[in-house]
Curated annotation (Swiss-Prot):
Pfam families: DHHA1 (PF02272), tRNA-synt_2c (PF01411), tRNA_SAD (PF07973)
Protein residues bound to Zn(2+): 564, 568, 676, 680
Enzyme Commission (EC) number: 6.1.1.7
Annotated domain remarks: Consists of three domains; the N-terminal catalytic domain, the editing domain and the C-terminal C-Ala domain. The editing domain removes incorrectly charged amino acids, while the C-Ala domain, along with tRNA(Ala), serves as a bridge to cooperatively bring together the editing and aminoacylation centers thus stimulating deacylation of misacylated tRNAs.
The record's free-text note on cofactor binding: Binds 1 zinc ion per subunit.
GO molecular function, one term: aminoacyl-tRNA deacylase activity
Protein name as catalogued: Alanine--tRNA ligase
EC class: ligase
Coiled-coil regions, chain positions: none
Record family assignment: Belongs to the class-II aminoacyl-tRNA synthetase family.
Main localisation: cytoplasm
Compartments where found: Cytoplasm
Length: 885
């Protein structure tokens, strides 16, 4: 029986032998397409090739594409776990022709693969074609020898594919597998087509038309092919099972889930194991491709998937985070085909564990509320939308999690009421919001762009230039002129000023003309390519149409260049030190410092930080040239340039390279290569020095570095050196010996603390106490030692109580420690022969009550508690004595 990995390899090798380029799967976050939530089909990475906007070095391709369908139009989340073939994550096998072969070859390739390579019986196969596609029908007869009754003509859009209202389109031909008459269902196009007997395994799309208008469709000059076969579906057929979750890959993941929970995938628990197996794949691959759980966008879809799996883990009785424990099983099954799982294993594991830990308590409270709210609901009833919204708003329950939790009881959710509650909250938030008023004026820049065009940026080559004022804006209104003392925004036809973007702050400087000067305090990009210089008129009057000279604050720009280039070096150094899972999550490039946010699941050690800093400074010392090139985005990424997934890039991108790598697989190649529109130093040596000054966490799975470069780094080190000298002087030693002196003082302090603690213990166990309490006394014939002590930590009370038990021989001991803050800790101990008469837990609870506390716990022979009112320590001793009496 062929396994999933073997089936994938057979498919790709077959098309490689038939002249196709084997193209790696693109990431789940589509490159250069922010309109698409996730990659959901094999053709996504070739969209621009099909439309003619992009050209590749090959005209035939084959892929096994990672896909996610959860959220938006393509959302399979609700059905996952309950049906045989729904998944949030799946692999799409495909072959593509870009103006090369067409219908006859596509049908021939498909038929030969499934009947010869895969060995499927021909009498189990039938196909559909679009009802007017005589060519496809005739080719199926010619190549496959199919009779007319096994070539079904479909008149609906199910067999006609379109990219949108306009653009490439064409008929489809789908291949179906007949699982046998023991399963209910009819062939496609029949009244019973929704049954499970006939299952689509491959869809061949013949792109032969271009839809120009709703009424006009013309032939494409170079018709193309796009096919898609679900790997999980064909694996089920080849492995002789009817259910995708019974293939070898899912059986391995479900087996791992069974072993981790101790619960078999049977009965009511079957769906939960399936949900966990599916959602583990989706979550792990999304995290590996740079998506982290959050409350919006792609991150929220990931969080929904993870939380749905966590709820099913809870149904299986898992008391601790489960998903991360199953990750090794996933990597064993899929790591060879997708090495990004191995590279990002640490990030995936930590993210899964942290998210589940954080959500666990909220999940339990939310499920408690849901149980109470639905207690009186019967099958067929609906949970009100207000409660569903409260679960979402207060407990972080995505709507689909609530629906899933009620599903087995046959209870629906009032989604309309949920949406009403959601809109009401948004309206209230808008009504309560008081902003700066900037948002209301943003649309003005689109109007200015339409009137005067985009600003030409000259700042890569120069820091000064001449231009013409295209527009003046004051208080959100375009004006013909501005005068001294007014705060205004200026648009010039061309500028050397960099507009804030990509984390780099905007430039400052001056704009001057005949009789006027404008001090520019910030530069922003508005609308689509309009550079807005924000500042104050310090002299004279300026008018639209005036010729001006623009001068950037060169010293400030130099510091920004240094910090921006250092950010690139630190990014690569982090990836080299921590792993290639590190990806930029945000940055700030200012003149005085830099800040860099990146994906990593745990704090960075001092040794790792030092390694990162050393690697960056190594490249700085190379004094290597910093080069920039304009390239096609796919060519840049193919050369290893790092891009931010989800960002929109133009046809051409600016690629910034610096340094030469000395280690690893990149040795001898450029050290850092990134897509970047910012300004940079000319040589790495211009950075001077980079010094990391802090590292910390800012969100789950996101860390932050702050660093200084150049003169700021030198001044920082100088300041640190002065501090060390001052410390050395205070300790009467030299800077070189200051660490030894500090360690000696620490050792001396520890010794004195031990001696002081011993002295306090001896005093506490002495024959009397100035603090209160007494020596051993008889209470109702029972030896009792009650002591009030100060200066003894709560953790030292138990050893004191053990010593006290030795003193009394047989009886009860109570020690109360009163801290400097006035709070008290109490320890009660009972000798072994007295445990049958007295419980230390009962005694210490009586003491705690007298001290204003509640509770306490431990063993019958030793228990501990506390209270806020140490002044009542004597009352606590009296309360315990009263219990003994």
């Amino acid at each position: 029986m062929a396994g999933v990995n073997e089936i994938r390899s057979t498919f790709l090798d077959y098309f490689r032998k038939n002249g196709h380029e084997v193209v790696p799967s693109s990431p789940l976050v589509p490159r250069n397409d922010p309109t698409l939530m996730f990659t959901n089909a094999g053709m996504v990475q070739f969209k621009n090739v099909f439309t003619g906007l992009e050209h590749r070095s090959y005209n035939r391709a084959t892929t096994s594409q990672k896909c996610v369908r959860a959220g938006g139009k393509h959302n399979d989340l609700d059905n996952v776990g309950y049906t045989a073939r729904h998944h949030t994550f799946f692999e799409m096998l495909g072959n593509f022709s870009f103006g090369d072969y067409f219908k006859e070859d596509a049908i021939s390739f498909a038929w030969n693969l499934i009947t010869r390579e895969f060995g499927l019986p021909k009498d189990k196969l039938l196909v559909t074609v679009y009802h007017t596609d005589d060519d496809a029908a005739n080719f199926w007869k010619k190549i496959a020898g199919l009779s007319d009754d096994r070539i079904i003509r479909i008149p609906t859009s199910d067999n006609f594919w379109a990219m949108g209202d306009t653009g490439p389109c064409g008929p489809c031909s789908e291949i179906f597998y007949d699982h046998g008459d023991h399963i209910w269902g009819g062939p496609p196009g029949s009244p019973e087509e929704d049954g499970d007997r006939f299952i689509e395994i491959w869809n061949l799309v013949f792109m032969q038309f271009e839809q120009q208008t709703p009424e006009l469709r013309i032939d494409l000059p170079r018709p193309s092919i796009d096919t898609g076969m679900g790997l999980e579906r064909i694996a089920a057929v080849l492995q002789g099972v009817h259910d995708n979750y019974d293939i070898d890959l899912f059986k391995a993941l479900i087996r791992a889930s069974e072993e981790a929970t101790g619960v078999k995938a049977e009965g009511d628990f079957r769906a939960s194991h399936r949900v966990i197996a599916d959602h583990l794949r989706a979550s792990s691959f999304l995290i590996a491709d740079g998506v982290l759980p959050s409350n919006e966008g792609r991150g929220y879809v990931l969080r929904r998937i993870m939380r749905r799996a966590m709820r099913h883990a809870q149904l299986l009785g898992a008391k601790e985070p489960l998903m991360w424990r199953l990750l090794p099983a996933l990597i064993r099954e899929m790591g060879q085909a997708y090495p990004e799982l191995i590279r990002a294993e640490s990030l995936i594991s930590e993210t899964l564990k942290l998210e589940e830990t954080r959500f666990r308590k909220t999940l339990e409270r939310g499920l408690g509320l849901l149980s109470d709210a639905s207690e009186n609901l019967a099958e067929g009833d609906r949970l009100d939308g207000e409660t569903a919204f409260k679960l979402y708003d207060t407990y972080g329950f995505p709507l689909d999690l609530t629906q899933d939790a009620l599903r087995q009881r046959g209870i629906a959710v009032d989604t309309e009421g949920f949406n009403v509650a959601m809109e009401r909250q948004k309206a209230e938030a808008r009504a309560n919001w008081t902003g700066s008023g900037e948002a209301a004026t943003e649309t003005i820049w689109f109007g200015i762009k339409d009137k005067v065009g985009a600003t030409e940026f000259l700042g890569y080559e120069t820091e000064s230039a001449e231009g013409v004022i295209a527009s003046l804006v004051r208080d959100g209104v375009e004006v013909p002129s501005v005068r001294e003392g007014e705060t205004i925004s200026v648009v010039v036809n061309q500028t050397p000023f960099y507009g804030e973007s990509g984390g780099q702050q905007g430039d400052t400087g001056t704009i001057s003309g005949e009789g006027f000067v404008i001090a520019v305090k910030d530069t922003q990009k508005k609308g689509e390519g309009v550079f807005v210089h924000i500042g104050e008129v310090t002299e004279g009057t300026a008018k639209a149409g005036d010729v001006v000279e623009l001068k950037v604050d060169s010293a400030r720009r130099t510091r920004i260049r240094s910090n921006h280039s250092a950010t690139h070096l630190l990014h690569e150094a982090l990836r080299e030190t921590l792993g290639t899972h590190v990806a930029q999550k945000g940055s700030l490039v200012a003149p005085d410092r830099l800040r860099f946010d990146f994906s990593h699941p745990k704090p960075i050690s001092a040794e790792e930080l030092e390694a990162v800093e050393n690697l960056a400074n190594e490249i700085i010392l190379q004094n290597a040239p910093v080069t920039t090139r304009l390239m096609a985005v796919d060519d840049a990424i193919a050369e290893g340039a790092m891009a931010l997934f989800g960002e929109k890039y133009g046809d051409e991108v600016r690629v910034v390279s610096m340094g030469t790598a000395k280690h690893g697989s990149k040795a001898g190649k450029a050290y850092s290569v990134e897509l970047c529109g910012g300004t940079h130093v000319r040589q790495t040596g211009d950075i001077g020095l980079v010094r990391i000054i802090s590292e910390g966490g800012v969100a789950a799975g996101v860390r932050r570095l702050e660093a200084l470069t150049g003169e700021a780094a030198r001044l920082y080190l100088e300041e640190q050196d002065e501090r060390v000298k001052a410390i050395a002087s205070a300790l009467k030693t030299t800077s070189a010996d200051v660490l030894d002196r500090v360690n000696a003082l620490i050792d001396e302090r520890k010794k004195l603390e031990r001696e002081l603690a011993d002295a306090r213990k001896k005093l506490a166990l002495g024959g009397g106490s100035s603090d209160g309490g007494s020596a051993v006394e008889a209470v109702n014939g029972v030896n009792f030692l009650g002591k009030i002590v100060t200066g003894v930590s709560p953790r030292d009370l138990k050893p004191l109580a053990d010593e006290g038990k030795k003193q009394v021989g047989s009886g009860v001991v109570l020690f109360i420690g009163v801290g400097e803050d006035g709070k008290a800790s109490a320890v009660a101990a009972v000798t072994e022969d007295m445990v049958g008469r007295f419980s230390a837990v009962d005694l210490v609870r009586a003491a705690s009550a007298a001290l204003g506390g509640a509770g306490g716990g431990g063993r019958p022979d030793m228990a501990q508690a506390g209270g806020p009112d140490g002044a009542k320590a004597a009352d606590a001793i009296a309360a315990v004595k009263a219990l003994i009496a």
